[in-house]
Curated annotation (Swiss-Prot):
ATP binds at G67, P68, E69, S70, S71, G72, K73, T74. The lineage of its organism: Bacteria, Pseudomonadati, Pseudomonadota, Gammaproteobacteria, Enterobacterales. Residues 335-355 are annotated as: Disordered. It is found in: Cytoplasm. Residues 341-355 have a biased composition (Acidic residues). The gene is recA. It comes from Sodalis glossinidius. Belongs to the RecA family. One of its GO terms (cellular component) is cytosol. Can catalyze the hydrolysis of ATP in the presence of single-stranded DNA, the ATP-dependent uptake of single-stranded DNA by duplex DNA, and the ATP-dependent hybridization of homologous single-stranded DNAs. It interacts with LexA causing its activation and leading to its autocatalytic cleavage. This is Protein RecA. Pfam families: RecA (PF00154), RecA_C (PF21096). Gene3D superfamilies: P-loop containing nucleotide triphosphate hydrolases. One of its GO terms (molecular function) is ATP hydrolysis activity.
Length: 355
């Protein structure tokens, strides 16, 4: 569409003035924006990366992961840290719950010697630390565990039983306004872990809500609802959890997808089990009876032995992972891998200010 010559000159002058005053790149045509292709970090789960559409969690954005107790929230974030560290990225863990287990983190592949960790006294201190790390431009991934544990200073200094209506919500709202722009400029991923509460007096719809007010819901580019849906057993011994993650909000790809995977105790996400299942589903791995074969070579009798083969041959696992990602990401076939989530399952869609 042609623009009037006088308007073009006026626009060019205005753009020149803006760039002179605020710096080059402060305004541009959208097609010229080099940051349109979103950089991502793997979640540690192939099926969840596919459900997210972009191949993982987006850098420069805010992400919220919420769910019931012992559902795998912290485990999932530690897997994200391990994946980021494998790409030589700097990570920080803001442990507001004072419950991070370094031994468990190390078992999941986290390099604890190079993981920055803070155990703040107040919510304001935790969020200020987040902002300082972000503005440094040197930290790539920040985890806050958890929003519910970000206690305002006034509440800590007050008496038990005092009313502090909306304090946490106001604190989070102010922090989101300040952090969002800094995260984008620094290309830092900020993940908030959140807990679930029940709304009183709800007769219809979902009574669940998350803590910390509504601001986090609006500013988050991705919201993940994680639930434990069953147990993984070896004989009578429970060795892990069957886990389902629903993508209830997604600003970088299609939302309302879900993924299921196993979290093994002491090991984390069973990525090799995912590779076997997805490989069979998409005909990269052949299954004849109980035998699994890859590229015409038998890799094991039974899923457990096939997983052991992939563990002993990481180059084969990496090759299979690459083939599946190339095949499924950004494709209709990939979208069919995960199912849509009903809108009523958006869960924790509203927050009460008092939480």
């Amino acid at each position: 569409m042609a623009i009037d010559e006088n308007k073009q000159k006026a626009l060019a002058a205005a753009l020149g003035q803006i760039e002179k005053q605020f710096g080059k790149g402060s305004i541009m045509r959208l097609g010229e924006d080099r940051s349109m292709d979103v950089e991502t970090i793997s979640t540690g789960s192939l099926s969840l990366d596919i459900a997210l559409g972009a191949g993982g969690l987006p850098m420069g954005r805010i992400v919220e992961i919420y769910g019931p107790e012992s559902s795998g929230k912290t485990t999932l974030t530690l897997q994200v840290i391990a994946a980021a560290q494998r790409e030589v990225k700097t990570c920080a863990f803001i442990d507001a719950e004072h419950a991070l287990d370094p031994i468990y983190a190390k078992k999941l592949g986290v390099d604890i010697d190079n993981l920055l960790c803070s155990q703040p006294d107040t919510g304001e201190q935790a969020l200020e630390i987040c902002d300082a790390l972000t503005r440094s431009g040197a930290v790539d991934v920040i985890i806050v565990d958890s929003v519910a544990a970000l206690t305002p200073k006034a509440e800590i200094e007050g008496e038990i039983g005092d009313s502090h209506m909306g304090l946490a919500a106001r604190m989070m709202s102010q922090a989101m306004r300040k952090l969002a722009g800094n995260l984008k400029n620094a290309n830092t991923l900020l993940i908030f872990i959140n807990q679930i509460r029940m709304k009183i007096g709800v007769m219809f719809g979902n009574p669940e809500t998350t803590t910390g007010g509504n601001a986090l819901k609006f500013y988050a580019s991705v919201r993940l609802d994680i639930r434990r849906i069953g147990s993984v057993k070896e004989g009578d011994v429970v060795v892990g959890s069957e886990t389902r993650v629903k993508v209830v909000k997604n600003k970088v790809a299609a939302p309302f997808k879900q993924a299921e995977f196993q979290i093994m105790y002491g090991e984390g996400i069973n990525i090799r089990g995912e590779l076997v299942d997805l490989g069979v589903k998409h005909k990269l791995i052949e299954k004849a009876g109980a035998w699994y074969s890859y590229n015409g070579e038998k890799i094991g009798q039974g899923k457990a032995n096939a997983c052991s083969f992939l563990k002993d041959h990481p180059e084969v696992a990496a090759e299979l992972d690459k083939k599946l990602r190339d095949m499924l990401l950004h494709s209709a076939e990939g979208n069919s891998l995960v199912s849509d989530v009903e809108s009523e399952d958006e869960g924790a869609s509203e927050s009460n200010e008092e939480f």
